[in-house]
Amino acid sequence: KAVATRQNILVAGGTGTGKTTLTNALLAEVARTTDRIVLIEDTRELQCTSPNLIAMRTKDGVATLSDLVRSALRLRPDRIPIGEVRGAEALDLIKAWGTGHPGGIGTIHAGSGMGALRRMEQLIQEAVVTVPRALIAETIDIVAVLVRDGHGRRLAELVRVDGLDPRGEYSLTSQGDI
């Protein structure tokens, strides 16, 4: 439902938890739409079979993830999925998702829904001193958290980001028992 309603989804978890696998499953749903997709990543991991796909990859000394996010905006994208968010490009990404390009998907290393939002803050601080918490809260709709434990890989937490509470903290709502 989140893909169909063009919500921005952040897939979080540690190494080997299945972030890329879940993101590829979500991209398979995106591929069923007629949306123009500009897929951005460092390493070719994501797979999208959409006929309306433009895939962009970083190149050392030539194009960073931030460069590609900004370039993607010139390509009239409907959706901007990104491989792994790991640096200052987090700011460019939430700006892009929040200014007419909803329906994005991205991955991040974090162990909880709140942790994923706080990690976004840390990454954004690589670009600016003051973190735009309201923009993060307005832009990221869903956080899916994956874990790998004795039972294998699984979805441990699925939360909706409702905005900021009166104290300025993120307000999250669990999306059911997992």
Q: What spans do the regions from the language model cover?
A:
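Phosphate-binding P-loop
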Residues: 1-6
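Generic beta-sheet signal
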Residues: 9, 37, 104-106
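Hydrophobic anchor at the beta1->P-loop junction of P-loop NTPases
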Residues: 11-13
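Walker A (P-loop) phosphate-binding loop of P-loop NTPases
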Residues: 16
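Conserved lysine of the Walker
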Residues: 19
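P-loop NTPase switch/communication element
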Residues: 24, 28-71, 116-120
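Conserved P-loop NTPase nucleotide-binding/switch module
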Residues: 43, 48, 72-164
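C-terminal regions of RecA-like/P-loop NTPase motor modules
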Residues: 167-178
